[in-house]
Regions:
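Bacterial Sec-dependent N-terminal signal peptides
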Residues: 1-23
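Aromatic-residue-lined binding/catalytic grooves and analogous aromatic/hydrophobic interfacial grooves
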Residues: 22-505, 523, 543-547, 556, ...
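Beta-strand segments within the central parallel beta-sheet cores of soluble alpha/beta enzyme folds
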Residues: 28-30, 239-241, 421, 460-463, ...
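Alpha-helix N-cap/helix-initiation motif
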Residues: 69, 392, 434-435, 506-510, ...
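Well-ordered alpha-helical segments within folded domains of soluble proteins
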Residues: 439-450, 510-522, 580-590, 645-654, ...
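Extracellular/periplasmic, surface-exposed regions of secreted and cell-surface proteins
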Residues: 499-515, 519, 527
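Non-catalytic carbohydrate-binding regions of carbohydrate-active enzymes
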Residues: 522-529, 533, 537-538, 545-555, ...
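Acidic/histidine-rich catalytic neighborhood
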Residues: 544-598
């Protein structure tokens, strides 16, 4: 995979937005109060010199983070590779910068490649001993053996070792544009984010002068652009400065008369990164002294920033080469992007950006109760009113589209997938290292990708999975004695697939993280029917994952196959066959069987997969009517744990449905009723999807309301706490599930429409089979659906209890009424 990185281009010019960017402005949110600069250089309270690698407190912990405005008040923009947050202070614009591959850790630390890679325990021989303990009903022995043998020497906290080999996503620093203004006498302040154009703006009036700023990050041009303008000439008095990542060593030098170059390496792993800055002024004076660019009395000012790292992904890493993930010259790339961006100018960059972004974003439109143009109050006020019980259908459709906006901004082809915080992070270290969490969080990030017509945005996930396969083969063999590949609970960008050092197996033992990830490749094929993708990219990964799952199963003497040992992620004991593990295994085996048949491959393997499906332990219903989470009926009816792993077969899987397995669906409903309607933001997002799969629109709507009220920050980011982006994507996916489902082999229209949404439409959804679907309803009932066939396959459509079947032709549209 060739990493795609970006430049940032900052313009401050007079003039209006281009005509294309003004064509649609309906979806946006805004604040009417500026933020302060109290979070400036948040790392260690503005004292980066206090950083040491042994510091026992993570700077990313929310309770110790003085930068609450960044988390809840900033405006996030991005193009998949670069993320930036706009704080919008009047005195000095503060922009936090991220490049998704700026990571500490990996094989290039001072202890070298062997220190990084030689971490897998040879624990496969213990598997039979654990199973013998289960057979003897000695669960304590089985648990002890698992705890002692299925971890690694790699800690999860940066203070626990030097150098910290797992690493963490880290800030690329902050940019400041001082204005010489104050808030005294200021009025009409507005800081806004348009979802229609992916454009952030700041505007205010000061001393009878109107000031405006505009910000966007272009994917096609690899640039971020910022424009300052005012109602009078000569009002741009700006000082640009840059605060670098404090755990790096570099040098700021002049880059021509009007530019700066920061060339640095991270202290932990010697990763090189470069940031170029230039200033172009029209009118006034420009000086370049002391690492700052100063403009006085200008009518227009342009600041250019380009940023990159030396990281390059590797599908087949050399375990003896510490530089196996090094392959880019950031000095060359930043110079190339800088020159091209300068030559285009602001208007062309904006036009390119808008055309590229709108091509994706405008594919889907949602209208709820004719609330399309109700953007009449600040977003924090809207949320406050909603929390008090006010109806706000505009907010509900805005949040839906915000999830799609975030996916476009944080996941585009050519780079890493969206991590725990997408592509936005304001610190050296962060919550859960801002990593790739493989026991739901990374998967949840991509739940809305195909259904909301953003399938291209899922491609980075598949690139990432391919970086996991080769190292994951070593993990599968050494720990579990299986064929194929898998990964564990947490991954980085350097092919890490092993467990971590903790003996807490409830979270650290996650052998089915790999199979869960692999199901996404089949789903992508099922939505797109891209047979070339299935053959050339997906199949070998799916096959390897299915072989891992098949080999992992314990063949008990009674003829039942169980996943021993296994857990229900982050919850409960080590088990001889947790429901979650069996549900994931069913899913990946079903995927592999179907893929094998389509491609006419691997009949011998397919027979093994089909045999496993016949013998795997069935779902069980417990003493209070619940779908059991473990092989024994030990579920606590008062348990309100955030993870609902045992309902994987209901969602995101396809082995539990009110239509095909009503008894299991009823037992799943009992689980959700007892788990409650609260928990973390992402957990409410998951439950929203599960209630939708149960076809209970009113309860799904209740979860959606709770997500907005209790799991959403003022800038619409999801909160765990702290900020985690997965809940945003889970929420968007859940709303889609309320309005359309296609996972059971047919297009199900309005399967969970709530009473609150009496009238509306959604256009551009994608259904499995390569269909595009528009849905219209009024008075709580379907009026019509319009279906475009992308592959000419047979189509089955369901509404309520009625079903229609039809043959289709590729490229033709069909209107369906019931």
């Amino acid at each position: 995979m060739n990493k795609k990185t970006v430049s940032i281009l900052t313009f401050a010019m007079l003039g209006a937005l281009s005509a294309t960017a003004q064509q649609k402005t309906a979806l946006s949110y805004w604040f009417d109060t500026p933020v302060t600069l109290k979070g400036q250089q948040v790392w260690y309270g503005g004292h980066p010199e206090k950083w040491t690698h042994k510091k026992p407190i993570s700077a990313g912990d929310t309770a110790r983070n003085p930068d609450s405005d960044w988390e809840s008040k900033s405006l996030p923009i991005g193009n998949g590779s670069i993320g930036a947050n706009i704080l919008g202070s009047v005195e000095a614009e503060r922009i936090t910068l991220n490049e998704k591959t700026l990571w500490r850790g990996g094989p290039n630390t001072k202890k070298g490649a062997a220190y990084y890679w030689d971490v897998n325990k040879n624990s496969a021989h213990v598997m039979q001993e654990i199973r013998d303990a289960f057979a003897a009903n000695d669960w304590e022995k089985a648990s002890q053996l698992t705890r002692k043998n299925f971890n690694s020497p790699v800690p999860y906290e940066s203070y626990a070792e030097d150098p910290f080999r797992f690493g963490s996503f880290t800030t690329m620093g902050e940019a400041y544009i001082e204005t010489g203004l104050s808030t005294v006498g200021m009025s009409k302040y507005r800081r806004a984010l348009s979802l229609d154009s992916a454009l952030a703006t700041v505007s205010f009036v000061k001393d009878e002068v109107s000031y405006q700023r505009e910000y966007f990050i272009s994917y096609p041009a690899n640039v971020m652009a910022i424009r300052y303008k005012a109602s009078r000439p000569g009002k741009q008095n700006l000082v640009f400065s840059y605060a670098p990542n404090p755990v790096s060593t570099g040098k700021m030098v002049a880059d021509g008369k009007n530019g700066l170059l920061w060339n640095a390496r991270l202290d932990n792993n010697d990763m090189q990164y470069a940031i170029r800055i230039r200033a172009i002024n029209k009118g006034g004076r420009l000086s370049n002294e002391g690492g700052k660019l100063t403009v006085k009395g200008a009518d227009e000012v342009v600041f250019l920033i380009s940023a990159d790292t030396d990281y390059k992904a590797n599908y087949n890493p050399d375990y003896n080469d510490p530089k196996t993930y090094v392959g880019v010259d950031p000095l060359a790339t930043t110079q190339d992007w800088m020159s091209k961006a300068e030559g285009k100018g602001y208007a062309q960059l904006l036009d390119e950006h808008y055309k590229d972004y709108s091509r994706l974003f405008n594919r889907v439109s949602l209208n709820l109760n004719d609330a399309a143009n109700a953007n009449d109050m600040p977003i924090d006020e809207r949320l406050a009113n909603y929390r008090k019980g006010a109806k706000d259908f505009y907010l509900e459709q805005l949040y839906y589209q915000f999830g799609r906006y975030l996916l476009i901004a944080s996941s585009r082809p050519g780079n890493m997938p969206a991590n725990l915080q997408g592509v936005w992070h304001n610190n050296v270290d962060g919550p859960w290292r801002v990593d790739y969490h493989n026991n739901i969080n990374l998967q949840m990030n991509y739940w809305p990708a195909c259904t909301t017509n953003l399938s291209e945005c899922e491609l980075p996930l598949f690139d990432f999975i391919q970086t996991q396969v080769k190292p994951g083969e070593k993990t599968a063999k050494s720990y579990y004695g299986t064929r194929g590949w898998t990964t564990s609970v947490s991954s980085n960008i350097f092919g890490f697939t092993s467990p971590l050092s903790s003996e807490d197996m409830s979270w650290n033992f996650s052998p089915f993280a790999g199979p869960w990830l692999a199901t996404h490749l089949w789903d992508y094929y099922d939505y797109t029917r891209d047979k070339k993708f299935l053959s050339e990219t997906a199949y070998d990964i799916i096959k390897g994952s299915a072989n891992f799952a098949t080999d992992y199963l314990w063949h008990r003497k009674d003829g039942v196959y169980t996943a021993a040992p296994s857990t229900s992620p982050e919850h409960g004991p080590i088990d001889e066959g947790a429901t979650f593990a069996h549900a994931v295994i069913r899913e990946i085996l079903l995927d592999a069987v179907e893929a094998s048949k389509i491609l006419g491959k691997d009949a011998k393997d397919r027979k093994q997969w089909e045999d496993a499906l016949k013998h795997i332990a069935p779902y069980q219903i417990g003493r209070y009517g619940q779908l059991m989470e473990w092989s024994k009926d030990i579920d606590d009816p008062k348990d309100e744990h955030r993870h609902v792993n045992h309902l994987f077969g209901l969602h995101p899987g396809r082995t539990i449905s009110p239509i095909t397995t009503p008894v299991l669906a009823k037992a799943s409903k009992v689980v959700l009723e007892h788990r409650g309607d609260g928990a973390t933001g992402w957990s409410m997002g998951w439950k929203l999807n599960q209630w939708a799969r149960l076809h209970d629109g009113n309860h799904a709507y209740k979860l959606y309301g709770n997500l907005l009220k209790n799991g959403t920050l003022d800038n619409l980011w999801d909160t765990h706490a702290p900020f985690q982006i997965d809940g945003n994507f889970g929420g968007t996916a859940g709303i889609t599930e309320m309005l359309m489902q296609s996972h059971m082999g047919f297009i199900h229209l309005l399967p969970a429409l709530p009473d609150a949404w009496q009238k509306g439409s959604i256009k551009g959804l994608r259904a499995k089979g390569n269909f595009t679907v528009d849905i219209y309803w009024d008075n709580g009932r379907l009026t019509k659906a319009v279906i475009l066939s992308g592959s000419g396959e047979p189509c089955q459509v369901r509404y309520g209890d009625k079903v229609k079947k039809m043959k289709t032709q590729k490229g033709k549209t069909y209107e369906v009424k019931f």
